[in-house]
Amino acid sequence: MNILVTNDDGVHAPGIVALAEALRLVGTVTVVAPDRERSAVGHALTLHHPLRVTEIMAGIFAVDGTPTDCVNLGIHTLLAEAPDIVVSGVNRGGNLGDDITYSGTVSAALEATLMGIPAIAVSLATNGHGSNYRAAAAFAAQLAREVLDRGLPRDTFLNVNVPDLPAEELGGPVITSQGKRDYGGDIVTKVDPRGRNYYWIGGNEPVFRDIEGTDFHAVKRGRISVTPLHLDLTNYASLSILQSWDLSACRPEAGQPSGALL
């Protein structure tokens, strides 16, 4: 089995080192990961400058791009054959609830799924530097075996969040839905020595709703959350509502200004 491993914390991050080691018991591992921290880049793809790749040792490649770039390069260029599975992680910090929309870790798995390859995103739900990557990686390797044996539903990948606990203290895995985070004004304003304002985004601790059956609910109780995510983002329940709207007045008229600002 050929396994492509990537992340958004960078090729030298402890999570990806532990993950690659665990997955070598499952198949042949190739690591293609960003050459530096790329957290919260979402599904960004580099289009306006060339990408550089460095093979830092046999089967381990560092890319000066995003996790999505890494998956593309791995599948289409760096691997001799397409991988049987892509595993992204182990991320430092959880990817829970609405936060998955920002996650480079999750987006790497999404990109693989777009290409028809089974994929798993794995995160260690820690507020610090994390110390139990091996436990998370061991679970990811076992889950990868299951996915390789059973397959996944079409256009579906798995988002896994593992509490930052020793293996013997972890609760069993549970299948969950995506949770919900409440967003506030998480902007920290500072003043530089020249009197100009600068800003940090995300300065406050995230607040998740503790809803039974969700990823956050499981992780908070020491259990491993496994959430199936789907490529189709359509809100089918809203289709009939929107179809009842009269949108005829929204058609642009000839001669209207372009709306250019400059």
UniProtKB/Swiss-Prot annotation:
This is 5'-nucleotidase SurE. GO terms for molecular function: 3'-nucleotidase activity; 5'-nucleotidase activity; exopolyphosphatase activity; metal ion binding; nucleotide binding. GO terms for cellular component: cytoplasm. Its EC number is 3.1.3.5. The keyword Metal-binding applies. Nucleotidase that shows phosphatase activity on nucleoside 5'-monophosphates. NCBIfam families: PRK00346.1-3 (NF001489), PRK00346.1-4 (NF001490), PRK00346.2-2 (NF001492), surE (TIGR00087). It catalyses: a ribonucleoside 5'-phosphate + H2O = a ribonucleoside + phosphate. It comes from Geobacter sulfurreducens (strain ATCC 51573 / DSM 12127 / PCA). Belongs to the SurE nucleotidase family. The lineage of its organism: Bacteria, Pseudomonadati, Thermodesulfobacteriota, Desulfuromonadia, Geobacterales. Binds 1 divalent metal cation per subunit. It is found in: Cytoplasm. The keyword Cytoplasm applies. InterPro entries: SurE (IPR030048), SurE-like_Pase/nucleotidase (IPR002828), SurE-like_sf (IPR036523). A divalent metal cation binds at residues 8-9, 39, 91.
